[in-house]
Amino acid sequence: MLRRPLLLVLFTVFSTLYAKDLRGVSPPTNESEAEVSPGDDEGPPEPGNEPDVNWRTLTIDPEDCKDKGKDCESLADEGNCLKKLNYAVGNCPWTCRFCKKENGDSKKCKDLAGERHCNGWKVKGDCVRLPDYMMQNCKLSCELCGPETRFKYTDEDVRCPEWAQAGYCSTNTDINLKCPHSCRKYKQRAPASTPYPYPVEALHPYQYRVVLPSVTILQTTTAAPSTQPAETTKAPPNTAAPTAAPTPAPTPAPAPAPTPAPVAPAPQTAPLAGSPPESTPEEQDDNSADESTEIEAGEGGGELCDEKHSSQQ
């Protein structure tokens, strides 16, 4: 009966000592020893699709921008800086590019981290995703300075190239002051049609991930093709329309002729004394008929006289 309590006491002591020893174990150096957390089985996060983390925790002062862990390079090369965010922030902030070094700025327009590395990080969108580090160590690749302004001007914000290309330099005074290089480089761009909708001063460095307003793309639904043949309607023959008979123009009513004024009868002159009275037209016709009869009779009498005269001879 005494063996069971004794075994229980020994097991408790052994468990306590083993737990204390585990506290001194260094962080895991490979994924097989790593502590599994939600999202660890997913692939490397794409720009703008990072795990749901509190980005305000990445505000690291330059004097604290130092690596403390021994596996920082492998952690970064394997893309686990965001997957194991809490460990990376506390032990590998510099290698994971979460901050900029104290007294690490340079006035020269060049990539302090190397052109090859900076170009690769720029393609991934890290100029905006990791602004503190990239602004200090990749300013040339991130287009914060360059030959367009003869290396005389340097932008103060990693969002300047996108702001300038969108036309905000001529519509926002704060952006114009923050972006002397980009606003000169893209001075020919048309002004933005709407004001910049976000705060120019970010609340924390990693708020920079949202640069330009999003554009909603309307998706048009395409109806599924029908399996039934479409009904075809025969077009009517191209028959010319009958020509309508022309409508005769209305005949204007004739204007009434003016009624002539009555002519007054000519005055009759009184016959002169001793002159025969004027005959009427009927009397003149009768007289002419009598005269013609007399002439015919005279001619006939002449012929008879000639016949008598010849017979007497």
UniProtKB/Swiss-Prot annotation:
Comp. bias (Low complexity): 222-244
UniProt GO molecular function: toxin activity
GO cellular component: extracellular region; nematocyst
Pfam families assigned: ShK
Ranges of Pro residues composition bias in the record: 245-265
Domain annotation ShKT: ranges: 65-99, 109-145, 151-186
Subcellular location: Nematocyst; Secreted
Keyword Disulfide bond: yes
Record keyword Disulfide bond present: yes
Signal peptide per UniProt: 1-19
Region of interest: Disordered: 24-56, 222-313
Coarse class of the protein's main subcellular location: other
Recorded superkingdom: Eukaryota
Tissue distribution: Nematocytes. In late planulae, is only expressed in a handful of nematocytes in the lower pharynx. Is absent from the tentacles and outer body wall.
SMART domains tied to this protein: ShKT
Sorted UniProt keywords: Disulfide bond, Nematocyst, Repeat, Secreted, Signal, Toxin
Skewed-composition ranges (Acidic residues): 32-44, 280-297
Disulphide bridges: 65-99, 72-92, 81-96, 109-145, 127-142, 160-179, 169-183
Annotated function: Probable toxin probably only used for predation.
Protein family: Belongs to the NEP3 family.
Name listed for the protein in its UniProt record: Nematocyst expressed protein 8
Top-level taxonomy: Eukaryota, Metazoa, Cnidaria, Anthozoa, Hexacorallia
